[in-house]
Design a protein with these regions (language model features):
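Short hydrophobic/aromatic beta-strand micro-patches
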Residues: 9, 74-76, 139, 214-216
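Residues that flank catalytic or metal-binding motifs in active/ligand-binding sites
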Residues: 45, 69, 132, 183, ...
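Vicinal oxygen chelate
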Residues: 2, 31, 58-60, 81, ...
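Core segments of cupin and vicinal oxygen chelate
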Residues: 8-53, 107, 139-192
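N-terminal/domain-start segments enriched in small and hydrophobic, helix-friendly residues
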Residues: 1-11, 50-53, 59, 66-74, ...
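Fold-core signature of tandem repeat domains
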Residues: 25, 71-75, 112, 159, ...
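Hydrophobic-ligand binding "helix-grip"
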Residues: 64-65, 205, 209
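Generic structural signal for short, solvent-exposed loop/turn connectors between secondary structure elements
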Residues: 34-46, 60-66, 125-132
């Protein structure tokens, strides 16, 4: 499992969406399914999928949050035909944010919002070796526009095996974007590729809990470290969730939690659920005690 994985919050379509995405992205699969009972959202389905080699968690937890393009997933394709095939599937019931076609940076590219509202950028790079097929991309808008570079450097200071890669900046004449801010930047955290950008255009959206980043931890010391470095909004601290100073949502979770939630013993799962619903930062020993009963 990657150190950092993406968590997608659906109203009630997590299982349906998991089937859809694993059918669209060839060679993908559903890894695990579980249901957590007696949460504030009622019975909650959790589905773990592997898409093009990367893990995603999908949850059905009510209509509290909506996906928006502040976070999108860049899919790097081997051929232009693969771009077209993915576009044809993801565009069913969706809408184009940037039309499929040729651009100065790619012979074949398009940005699509699928039928669930999730944003995908599909791109073909000729002659380039592909190390990671899906790259989570952060767009800094409105109150955090112009802070993409600051945020990228901050994240690189928090995580290990991290560095900032290529940076493309806006030039004079590309208003409303400010000269020198980030047009596109690649960066690596825990050996995983990410991307970031600023956009000063008018947007009616921002980062929210519909997409959060899960940090998987082995020990309480790890949990304490990431929680202390990332959390910037005490009001957002709940059930392992936090919000950083840029508005991005994270979950700092113990690895053992996934195994607890897959347990066939409903009483054990219920005890763990009751315990973690009362927590802000996860207490690993308290979760183990609840599990043991």
């Amino acid at each position: 499992m990657e150190k950092i994985t993406s968590h997608l919050w659906f109203d009630k379509e997590a299982r349906e969406a998991a089937e859809f995405y694993t059918s669209v992205f060839k060679g993908s699969r559903i890894k695990d399914t579980a249901t957590i009972s007696n949460t504030p959202s009622g019975d909650t389905d959790i589905v773990t999928v592997e898409l093009l080699g990367q893990e995603f968690t999908l949850i059905s937890a009510g209509p509290l949050f909506k996906f928006n393009p502040s976070i999108s997933f860049l899919v790097v394709c081997n051929t232009k035909e693969e771009v077209d095939a993915l576009w044809n599937e993801l565009s069913k019931g969706g809408k184009a944010l940037m039309d499929l076609g040729a651009y100065p940076f790619s012979e074949r590219y398009g940005w699509i919002q699928d039928k669930y509202g999730l944003s995908w950028q599909l791109i073909f790079f000729s002659g380039r070796a592909i190390r990671q097929r899906i790259v989570l991309t952060l767009m800094f808008v409105d109150r955090v526009v112009g802070r993409a570079e600051e945020a990228i450097n901050f994240y690189a200071s928090v995580f290990r095996n991290a560095f900032v890669g290529d940076i493309q900046r806006y030039r004079k004449g590309e208003e409303p974007d400010v000269e020198g801010t980030i047009k596109h930047a690649s960066f690596t955290l825990e050996g995983q590729q990410f991307a970031g950008m600023d956009s000063a255009r008018e947007h009616n959206f921002a980062f929210n809990e519909a997409i959060s980043l899960m940090v998987h931890c082995e020990t309480q010391e790890e949990i304490d470290y990431y929680w202390g470095r990332l959390s910037a909004d005490p009001k957002a601290e709940q059930c392992g969730w936090l919000r950083d100073k840029y508005g991005l949502s994270w979950q700092v979770v113990p690895n053992i939690m996934a195994e607890m939630m897959k347990d066939k013993d409903e009483k054990r799962k219920a005890r763990v659920t009751e315990a973690f619903l009362k927590m802000k930062k996860f207490d690993l020993e308290a979760l183990k005690r609840a599990y043991r009963g």
